[in-house]
Swiss-Prot record:
Top-level taxon in the UniProt lineage: Bacteria
Name of this protein: Large ribosomal subunit protein uL1
Family: Belongs to the universal ribosomal protein uL1 family.
InterPro entries to which the protein is assigned, alphabetical: Ribosom_uL1_bac-type, Ribosomal_uL1, Ribosomal_uL1-like, Ribosomal_uL1/biogenesis, Ribosomal_uL1_3-a/b-sand, Ribosomal_uL1_CS
Function: Binds directly to 23S rRNA. The L1 stalk is quite mobile in the ribosome, and is involved in E site tRNA release.
Originating species: Rickettsia peacockii (strain Rustic)
Amino acid sequence: MSNKKDVAVKISGGKKIREAREKVKSDTLYNLTNAVERLKSASYVKFDPTLEIVMKLGIDSRHSDQMVRGVVNLPAGTGKTVRVAVICKEEREEEAKSAGADLVGSTNIIDEIKAGKINFDVCIATPDMMAAIGSVARILGPKGLMPNPKLGTVTLDIKNAIKNAKSGQVEYRAEKAGIIHAGLGKLSFSDQDLLKNLNAFIEAVIKAKPAGLKGSYLKAMYLSSTMGASVQIDLTSIA
């Protein structure tokens, strides 16, 4: 049976949620600046939530020529600690370690992946290791961890790849319904830093518009915070 203290906590929590929801109007379109301000004022959780973006694109991702995918280097970073694994030959392991990689190796890492031990957020590989990594493609692929030259994670420039991954590089990929979702920093960031990240991400997605696409590309955009409110963005305010 709940005691009076538990009941008081539940009432207090419910009140905070109601007050937060009242600060955001579901039938209103916001520009990016106002959206960030509203989400901050409406946040009620005790942890530092992530600012999340959802973009609805007018594409059919079932067609190979309408795939939208890429990476963005966020100017203000993500606010997260990123664990980077580098799979390379022995002669380049020291270089990877010096550049800040958290996990460095070759077939030993591949064996760990096969055993289900995946304790990294980004996997970088040199081209000469890709044949061996192919044996774990079905494991890494669905998790979004498979090294890819288009994303800069299959490269000879190990140092720069590690730097990008650590400094706030975010991958985006349109899902079947043309939806792109990404976290773009912590709500504790300054408004200016969040807007820098938002503008960099939106610009990258817009530039990735398929050349042969007919009709409108950007259909809708929403911003939200973890366990918080969601606001719709006025697309006419996007430069």
